[in-house]
Each structure stands twice: as structure tokens, then as C-alpha cells.
Regions:
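Bulky hydrophobic segments
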Residues: 1-107, 112, 119-145
């Protein structure tokens, strides 16, 4: 199995795990019971999001790496992740404003917190991918060395 397929499989497992934990958290009120549970979930969501972005842009990521351009890779990953997470936060505000749903508790400070911890998680996920690429020597294969 190639690395792209492994990344997708890990993404699917992590997404399913996150779904289960979130379902349990809502049922048992963990978001209200544990002070930093929301931060932990957004960090985990960032890792999951990074795995998805790595799978989606796999060839582009390898191209960045084959040109030894880590800075552009991290910037690209972070901007794409922030765009997706930002749209999610806009959706939360919209749903709360339009439908009067109050359990989302959308507010600017929470949104900033969500974006920060999600982005940190996405950087951890990207770092995992970079270490995997390095351990499998995929860069040499890309360069033809």
C-alpha cells in the first residue's frame, strides 16, 4: 500500500474516532464538564484536517518537498486549513444567527481559540507526514536519485 492510501486510511480512522468521541462528549456533557475539552477536540480536528489535506494535495506536497521548499508547504497547508476552518466558524455564526440555535455558543474569542488550536493540530499532522516521507525516502524517488 502506498503512502497516499495509508494517509487516507489513517484519516478515515481518525475521523471516525473523532465522530465517536464528539458523540460521547455531547451525550455526557464533556464540553461543559472539562475546561479544555473544546481545545483538545479542535486540536484533534486539525490533525484530521491535515491528514485530509495531505491526501487531497498529495502530489503537490511531494512536489514542494522535492524542491526542498518546506516553508511554502507549511504556508500552503496552513492557509488551506485556515480557509476551511474559517468557513466553518462563519457557518456557526450564521446558523446561530439565522436559526437561533444557542447550543453552538459562537463568539469571537471562541472562534479565535478554535482556529488557533485547529491550526496547531494541522501542523502536527503535517509534521507526521513529513517524517513518514523522510523515513520512506520518497523525496529521493521523486528526484530520481
Amino acid at each position: 500500500m502506498n503512502l497516499r492510501a495509508k494517509v487516507f486510511r489513517r484519516f478515515a480512522y481518525l475521523l471516525f474516532g473523532l465522530f465517536i468521541v464528539n458523540t460521547l462528549a455531547n451525550y455526557f456533557y464533556w464540553y461543559q464538564s472539562f475546561t479544555n475539552f473544546d481545545r483538545l477536540m479542535h486540536f484533534a480536528g486539525g490533525v484530521v484536517g491535515s491528514f485530509f489535506l495531505t491526501w487531497l494535495f498529495y502530489e503537490k506536497y511531494l512536489k514542494f518537498l522535492s524542491h526542498r521548499n518546506l516553508k511554502k508547504l507549511f504556508i500552503f497547508n496552513t492557509l488551506i486549513f485556515l480557509a476551511a476552518a474559517g468557513l466553518w466558524e462563519v457557518m456557526e455564526f450564521s446558523v446561530q444567527g439565522i436559526f437561533g440555535v444557542d447550543h453552538l455558543l459562537a463568539n469571537p474569542m471562541d472562534s479565535v481559540d478554535d482556529l488557533v488550536f485547529g491550526t496547531l493540530g494541522s501542523l502536527v499532522g503535517l509534521t507526521y507526514f513529513l517524517n513518514k516521507v523522510r523515513s520512506l525516502n520518497l523525496i529521493k524517488k521523486q528526484n530520481g536519485n
